[in-house]
């Protein structure tokens, strides 16, 4: 014979199981890192392995490529880091450090996983080639000069055409 107490007990256990069913997916979702969080973790790893005197901080993150939803699948990343004023031996977060004036800039590429529990990364960083930076400055300045010159040339052509039109005397 079933008692009223058994009915309450069954209802209570049903409620507990229902709540567990709702909470477990949230716990799984909470373990997935965002693209930027995964990159910041990779930078922490780069700083730990670095033999340089100062920490590096994220300078520029390339747009996130289209990815599948599996957090365990390695995702391609590329970003740029720059040397900060904080010594590597500090316990300070690189995000709290100012960039060092004329600090070393490194271009990093590789893969990260978004699974927080088993997060991993395979990143390699190379110094940004100063020649390419200088070449970029050259092209930027050339573009500015060409822009100014083209305006001047257009104005000269307009003036020339205005002088070609016969003037009528009134």
Curated annotation (Swiss-Prot):
Record PTM: Proteolytically cleaved by proteinase PRTN3 into antibacterial peptide LL-37. Proteolytically cleaved by cathepsin CTSG and neutrophil elastase ELANE.
Region (Active core): 150-162
UniProt-recorded Gene Ontology molecular function terms: lipopolysaccharide binding
Disulfide bonds: 86-97, 108-125
Record Gene3D superfamilies: 3.10.450.10
Keyword Cell membrane: no
Propeptide positions: 31-131
Location of the protein in the cell: Secreted; Vesicle
Keywords in alphabetical order: Antibiotic, Antimicrobial, Cleavage on pair of basic residues, Disulfide bond, Immunity, Innate immunity, Secreted, Signal
InterPro entries: Cathelicidin-like (IPR001894), Cathelicidin_CS (IPR018216), Cathlecidin_C (IPR022746), Cystatin_sf (IPR046350)
Leader peptide range in chain numbering: 1-30
Record has Cell wall biogenesis/degradation as a keyword: no
Major location (coarse): secreted
Gene Ontology terms: cellular component: extracellular space; vesicle
Domain of life, per lineage: Eukaryota
Any single GO BP term: defense response to Gram-positive bacterium
Entry's family note: Belongs to the cathelicidin family.
Its job: Antimicrobial protein that is an integral component of the innate immune system. Binds to bacterial lipopolysaccharides (LPS). Acts via neutrophil N-formyl peptide receptors to enhance the release of CXCL2. Postsecretory processing generates multiple cathelicidin antimicrobial peptides with various lengths which act as a topical antimicrobial defense in sweat on skin. The unprocessed precursor form, cathelicidin antimicrobial peptide, inhibits the growth of Gram-negative E.coli and E.aerogenes with efficiencies comparable to that of the mature peptide LL-37 (in vitro).
PANTHER family in the cross-refs: CATHELICIDIN, CATHELICIDIN ANTIMICROBIAL PEPTIDE
Comment on protein domains: The cathelin-like domain (CLD), which is the propeptide part, does not seem to exhibit auto-inhibitory function, as it does not inhibit the antibacterial activity of antibacterial peptide LL-37.
The protein's name in its UniProt record: Cathelicidin antimicrobial peptide
Organism: Gorilla gorilla gorilla
